[in-house]
């Protein structure tokens, strides 16, 4: 059938994607610390360079960030997204939720409140809280308001800057593996699809 022929072509095309591999640090592909990585097949390029009148920088972090992180509150994690991650339970090898959750979203939890400064040099509760007239966090006023970590700068200076140069991955090797797994599953070969999914989970958490 045409559907079968199409799926066979899909498998063939994905088998021809070579020379790529999964990146261990998932978040590095979305914060400018690992542009055009070995997992990236195609990504939208940005740059802070203004040579010869060029303007390839963006304000993506302002659109992504919550107001607590000096953003515009335009693109926020939904309750559905957070629930989808958490309903699996704390099953990661770290003893926490899926590691990709912590690399994708800032939210109120022990991980972001352990004194390691994972939220721009401080704890989550010192960003998402009320402040006194001297701009000091008021103890006991913290709240949970998830904010995307993906497509946000890695450090305070980057957060403070009104512009950023974070590339946007449009196709990654992980996407290729997932598409191949989907086709294999639809063909009735879940035993071949599962190892592809596990390969991603083993690397990305």
Region roles according to the model:
Residues 201-205:
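Conserved catalytic neighborhood of penicillin-recognizing serine enzymes
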């Amino acid at each position: 059938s045409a559907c079968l022929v199409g799926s066979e072509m899909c498998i063939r095309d994905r088998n021809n994607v070579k020379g790529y591999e999964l990146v261990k640090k998932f978040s590095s592909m979305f914060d400018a610390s690992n542009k055009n990585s070995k997992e990236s097949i195609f990504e939208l390029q940005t740059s802070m360079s203004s040579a010869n009148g060029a303007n390839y920088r963006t304000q993506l972090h302002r659109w992504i960030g919550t107001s607590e992180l000096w953003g515009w509150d335009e693109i926020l994690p939904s309750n559905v997204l957070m629930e989808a991650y958490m309903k699996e339970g704390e099953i990661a090898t770290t003893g926490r939720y899926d590691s990709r959750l912590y690399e994708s979203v800032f939210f109120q939890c022990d991980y972001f409140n352990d004194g390691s400064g994972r939220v721009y040099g401080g704890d989550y509760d010192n960003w998402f809280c009320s402040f006194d007239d001297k701009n000091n966090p008021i103890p006991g006023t913290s709240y949970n308001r998830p904010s995307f970590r993906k497509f946000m700068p890695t450090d305070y200076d980057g957060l403070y800057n009104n512009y950023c140069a974070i590339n946007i991955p449009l196709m990654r090797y992980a996407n290729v593996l997932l598409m191949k797994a989907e086709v294999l599953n639809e063909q009735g070969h879940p035993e071949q699809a599962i190892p592809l999914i596990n390969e991603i989970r083993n690397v990305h958490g």
